[in-house]
């Protein structure tokens, strides 16, 4: 794998979350340094977080992000290589290329570490 940042595109298969909103994987980015060391980013599109026309507020989205970390991201870590120090789960109402400023997009981010086989929320 080397030291290069790697990305794997997602697909349009809906992923179940507690709120019931439609969520799809945009991409997974790994082998990228983060503030806590090796970081894996799972980036999801969740149109219902949009401020206009959306039905999911931030507090509801937080529960969805925890569920995505526990039931989607964490089980897939073994397929990506070394266990990361941190997992970032992001939701965006529209697909945004990684590293691109998109002030028109609504985006939520949460950071997690893995402890005792579960995702532990971290201050981000």
Language model: regions and residue ranges:
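Surface-exposed beta-strand edges and their flanking turn/coil or helix-capping segments
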Residues: 38-40, 54-57, 102-104
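N-proximal, solvent-exposed amphipathic alpha-helical segments enriched in charged/polar residues
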Residues: 2-39, 48-50, 123
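Mature extracytoplasmic domains of secretory-pathway proteins
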Residues: 43-88
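A generic short-segment signal for beta-strand/edge and adjacent turn/coil regions
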Residues: 6-14, 54-61, 113-115
